[in-house]
Regions:
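Acidic, PIN/NYN-like endoribonuclease modules and their adjacent C-terminal/linker elements
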Residues: 95-125
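Acidic, metal-associated active-site segment
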Residues: 84-100
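Short beta-strand scaffold positions
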Residues: 36, 64, 85, 103-104
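Alpha-helix capping/helix-boundary segments
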Residues: 9-10, 40, 69, 89-90, ...
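Phosphate- and divalent-cation-binding pockets in alpha/beta enzyme and binding domains
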Residues: 43, 72, 111-112
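Short, well-structured N-terminal submotif of metal-dependent ribonuclease cores
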Residues: 1-36, 45-58, 125
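Acidic catalytic patch
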Residues: 60-80, 92, 106
Length: 125
């Protein structure tokens, strides 16, 4: 089983968080390619000078955001009474992939996860 990274994980990687990098390396060495989403990349990418971020992303699969997913994400936001489209897309992507989520903000993603089937597990940094 792989994992989906949220923006907090990418920010930590960009800042050189050794624990995040070590965890990422272990996953890759085990043949598990982590996922993140294009909206998450857009949320954290600010400059081509973010070399650590770009290096980290080379070891990730980046899921797009389709119009069909947009309807599912919108329905999830309505059910959960939340408004963060990026977090909702992370949760929706994880559920679709049968994955769990690694996040720096477990409260928001746990609230979303409770409205998804199949359920996803939310892990905190």
């Amino acid at each position: 089983m792989t994992i989906v990274y949220d923006g907090g994980v990418l920010i930590a990687a960009d800042r050189g968080d050794r624990r995040v990098w070590a965890d990422h390396r272990v996953r890759l060495e085990a043949g598990l390619v982590p996922l993140t989403t294009a909206p998450v990349v857009a949320q954290v990418s600010r400059s081509p000078r973010q070399v650590p971020l770009r290096r980290f992303l080379r070891g990730c699969e980046i899921a797009g955001f389709t119009s069909d997913q947009g309807h599912g994400v919108g329905a999830l936001l309505a059910k959960s009474r939340t408004s963060d489209v990026v977090d909702a897309h992370v949760a929706f992507t994880a559920a679709g992939a049968g994955s769990s989520v690694l996040t720096s903000d477990p409260a928001d993603l746990t609230a979303l996860a409770s409205h998804l089937r199949p359920r996803i597990v939310v892990h905190s940094l």
